[in-house]
Amino acid sequence: MASLLDCGAGLASANASFSTATDLSQENGLFSSWFERCSKTQIAVTIFAVLIAYDQFMYIWRKGSIAGPAFKIPFMGPFIQALYPKFDAYLAQWASGPLSCVSVFHKFVVLASDRDIAHKVFKSPTFVKPCIVPMAETLLRPSAWVFLQGRAHTEYRRGLNGLFTNKAISTYLPAQEKVYDDYFERFVAASEANKSKPMAFMRLFREINCALSCRTFFGDYISQDAVEKIAEDFYQVTAALELVNVPLSVYIPFTKCWRGKRTADAVLAEFASCAAACKANMAAGAEPKCIVDQWVLHMMESKRYNDRIAAGETGAEKPKNLIREFTDEEIGQTMFTFLFASQDASSSATTWLFQILAQRPDVLDRLREENLSVRGGNKETPFELSMLESLPYTNAVIKELLRYRPPVIFVPYEATKKFPVTPNYTISKGSMIVPSCYPALHDPQVYPDPETFDPERWITGDAESKTKNWLVFGAGAHDCLARKYVPLTMAAMIGKASLELDWVHHATSQSEEIRVFATLFPEDECQLVFTRQG
């Protein structure tokens, strides 16, 4: 009986196999017949149409109910607009809704203009990671500390916090004072060479900020030639920082991404060399004068402590900043992330600060008077950290400048998993989510008459209490490490300039038009004439 059942099962199986094979043969025959009847062009057009339909379907599915174009330009999306961004287009995008989207090539990008949604993104490290822009990991290296998450990021950042204490910052000021002396002389010389006719100062403002950063990071370990070359070449890095790049363009010679990568590699090598020189100098007993000096000093103190503990000593005093040892390459890489974060933002802030104060002599006169008073009437007195607390109006000017023309208008993140941004919208894994800072800083409900530059709102108004809207330095685990250092250096720069220089802004039809180049700049590049005060 069993054998009969087995035989029947075998026959049934054979019949089923034969039937399946026959069906497949018929299907293959149909496909073969179709392919034979179609030309190569027809096949290519069909495949292309299927890909377009898939690309369109994925865009519509990801878009869901949020604002954005109803359909996507096949494959590339608004790539041309991304290459040449217009500030008015950003304003329109932010105004279209609290969440809006675009899709460029393979990247789906959601912009968050709502303040509370921006805070949620900044404070959701389990759902998102900073990506800055897609090219950032290539330029900075994937191992850079800014891309670390969780405990690894927290511990690395804790070790860097000690570089921005009041005590540490005070050691950087003499080097910065020398930079101001040098470049203020250059500003005047440039105007004289141009026969006191207005000229664009945006390039020199980029250079002074690069010099400030490099001297603050490395002191005299870096040469002036290297500083000037980095200031000139770093433009290539900024140019590569488009929100979305052509895929694989970093491997195509002479593209923006290719040039940016070469520049980044050269800067990293220079910074690693400076780190090695610093270690040798500090090992010889030198006093710290720059950020890397302070960092290496903390490493040396930590090593001595660990050695004493390892030797069984019980009374060893634990350093305030107990950290591991870092290689020259790690130090160089970290300083490069600082330069990466500061160069364009600081250059933008400096450009607008000099332009706006030239347009507002009432503000400049009051700032000048305050800075002379805090120096006891002697304009030659160097800036000291203790002066900052005695400069309420200068601080208000800096804060209003950072609100009025924020140097960071948004911070791109990438979703590491499905992220329920709102109860009604979930962003898919791998998509970019971009919390925007500008709308919160120009909210008329929080800052009345937001398009007017008004430092007084920080003194007699209630702007100081609107902390949730103060997104200049971001929020959450990845907020700006230098949120105290940045206003300090700006106050030092403009305070010294107000006492030593006069400058006149020659307005053009493009002075108030905003160019988007990583951050915000005046379209005419700030037409000024500098002279020495009598």
From Swiss-Prot:
Organism, as annotated: Gibberella zeae (strain ATCC MYA-4620 / CBS 123657 / FGSC 9075 / NRRL 31084 / PH-1)
UniProt catalytic activity: 5-dehydroepisterol + NADPH + O2 + H(+) = ergosta-5,7,22,24(28)-tetraen-3beta-ol + NADP(+) + 2 H2O
Protein function: The third module or late pathway involves the ergosterol synthesis itself through consecutive reactions that mainly occur in the endoplasmic reticulum (ER) membrane.
Location of the protein in the cell: Endoplasmic reticulum membrane
Phenotype seen when the gene is deleted: Leads to a severe decrease in conidiation and virulence when ERG5A is also deleted. The absence of both ERG5A and ERG5B seems not to affect the ergosterol production.
Binding site for heme: C480
Topology of this chain in the membrane: Single-pass membrane protein
Gene Ontology cellular-component terms listed: endoplasmic reticulum membrane
Protein name: C-22 sterol desaturase ERG5B
Principal cellular location given in the protein's record: endoplasmic reticulum
Source taxonomy: Eukaryota, Fungi, Dikarya, Ascomycota, Pezizomycotina
One Gene Ontology MF term: monooxygenase activity
The protein's required cofactors: heme
SUPFAM superfamilies linked: Cytochrome P450
Enzyme class of the recorded protein, top EC level: oxidoreductase
Assigned EC number: 1.14.19.41
Protein family: Belongs to the cytochrome P450 family.
Membrane-spanning residues: 43-61
Additional information: In Fusarium, the biosynthesis pathway of the sterol precursors leading to the prevalent sterol ergosterol differs from yeast. The ringsystem of lanosterol in S.cerevisiae is firstly demethylised in three enzymatic steps leading to the intermediate zymosterol and secondly a methyl group is added to zymosterol by the sterol 24-C-methyltransferase to form fecosterol. In Fusarium, lanosterol is firstly transmethylated by the sterol 24-C-methyltransferase leading to the intermediate eburicol and secondly demethylated in three steps to form fecosterol.
GO biological process: sterol biosynthetic process
InterPro entries the record matches: Cyt_P450, Cyt_P450_E_grp-IV, Cyt_P450_sf
Pathway where it operates: Steroid metabolism; ergosterol biosynthesis
Entry keyword set: Endoplasmic reticulum, Iron, Lipid biosynthesis, Lipid metabolism, Membrane, Metal-binding, Monooxygenase, Oxidoreductase, Steroid biosynthesis, Steroid metabolism, Sterol biosynthesis, Sterol metabolism, Transmembrane, Transmembrane helix
